[in-house]
Amino acid sequence: MSSDPGYQAPVVTVSSSIPRRGVGDSVLIVPVVTRDDAAAVLAAAPFLDKDAVREIEAALKSLGATGGEGQTHRLVVSALPVASVLTIGLGKERDEWPADTVRRVAGNAARSLDKVAAVLTTLSALDLEAAIEGLILGSYRFTEFRSAKTAPKDGGLRAITALSQESKSRARDAAQRATDIATAVATARDFVNTPPSHLHPDEFAKRAKALGEAAGLEVEILDDKALVKAGYGGIVGVGKGSSRPPRLVRLSHKGAVRTRTRGARTGGSKRVALVGKGITFDTGGISIKPAANMHHMTSDMGGAAAVIATVVLAAKQKLPIDVIATVPMAENMPSATAQRPGDVLTQYGGTTVEVLNTDAEGRLILADAIVRACEDNPDYLIETSTLTGAQTVALGSRTPGVMGSDAFRDRVATLSQQVGENAWAMPLPEELKDDLKSTVADLANVSGSRFAGMLVAGTYLREFVADGVEWAHIDVAAPAYNSGGPWGYTPKGGTGVPTRTMFAVLEEIAREG
């Protein structure tokens, strides 16, 4: 991450035609489809003349191109002023193109042009915002810890010209929105990809503060002494084993319409609480994890990263609602001072908990944060976390699980699917609460069963949500971190999920309540 707050996106401009000058080093990205078993140029008019289209299609025919989704070909086209053309396949021709298909193929195109500084594209004629988001997210790279020996010699993608016939004002607003959303996702990725040696709780809090203040947010940070004094037993308990003490960060966007006299929210303005798990590294504590793949636990603050990025995005987009993020941060380490299996701690608000497994630490810090967030009297609460390995077992590496109050849970899942993050609604059966009974405290932090682990964790969190608050818990244990190869606009490493889901929910609440 640079010394400037947050990720620096490529410069985006929108044009109604291909410039005749100044694009000699640029690559033009052109979508093609499968038509009669061959590749055909899509969205050509009015940007490409007939000579350019004929030249492109003739070259593709000679190469045996079919226009299959993700298929790319680099061509030199004499009829165009650009250095080269990259065709990107969309698959079989259709009347309408889903936004995430456009986003995904734009990401594929950007990844195939990783050494190109400037691009133009007609993909934006299909969906302006999706094309810009896909290009920015597909071009993302994390190089902060590369020395001169291995750092890329080029600067990556720095300029995007999106070709569109939208009105100037509409195009300008859409391009800015897309850039802001992609920047938020990339910022969350940067946090996740930063190693725990450089992103311990205090440093994480400082970076969150810098981002928040740059966006005009109100920022509050509680250090370890303040946490002890206020009774945040979950956060303090988890952080006891580390030499790097915990923090609680609060970031507030006050966008709701207020009365002139008392400054109170008007009746139609909503308040949304965001809560994100910020375990900067998770060894499991005394209940230590296996060594294999423990290095992936650098991503155990993926929920916090997404929440911070989302509240900053809400401020940039000036959403007319209040959004208050409550982000607990701790490092879960084994040591002589660490909490032990069998210890009892008191969560913020007074609930006592028997800690049967110190590797179920996320729910302990989240419970504190949820109770604190509910003191702000939100209408809605969204919590997200890399909470359980059971999410991966149940839903795989790309599908978040959403639990919570039924109507709001379904609303979150639906919007997540619309933006391409593809969360799936899951139940919280009442009988699972019995599995969290303790003989010595109000609750145990785990059940005695290996079944339904994702749902049991959600059931635990439900105990701390105030009555009357519509809430959703998004488990992104696997989706927050791509341990495999890149695909679409998703790189290896931090993904930024579920930033776009949460922002989509905030936008809908701002529109509809």
Swiss-Prot record:
It catalyses: Release of an N-terminal amino acid, Xaa-|-Yaa-, in which Xaa is preferably Leu, but may be other amino acids including Pro although not Arg or Lys, and Yaa may be Pro. Amino acid amides and methyl esters are also readily hydrolyzed, but rates on arylamides are exceedingly low; Release of an N-terminal amino acid, preferentially leucine, but not glutamic or aspartic acids. It comes from Mycobacterium sp. (strain JLS). It is an enzyme of class 3 (hydrolase). Mn(2+) 2 binds at residues 277, 282, 300, 361. HAMAP family: Cytosol_peptidase_M17. NCBIfam families: PRK00913.1-2 (NF002073). Belongs to the peptidase M17 family. Transmembrane segments: none annotated. The gene is pepA. GO terms for biological process: proteolysis. Mn(2+) 1 binds at residues 282, 359, 361. PROSITE patterns: CYTOSOL_AP (PS00631). The active site is at 289, 363. Keywords: Aminopeptidase, Cytoplasm, Hydrolase, Manganese, Metal-binding, Protease. This is Probable cytosol aminopeptidase. One of its GO terms (molecular function) is metalloaminopeptidase activity. Binds 2 manganese ions per subunit. Presumably involved in the processing and regular turnover of intracellular proteins. Catalyzes the removal of unsubstituted N-terminal amino acids from various peptides. It is found in: Cytoplasm. Its EC number is 3.4.11.1, 3.4.11.10. Its main location: cytoplasm.
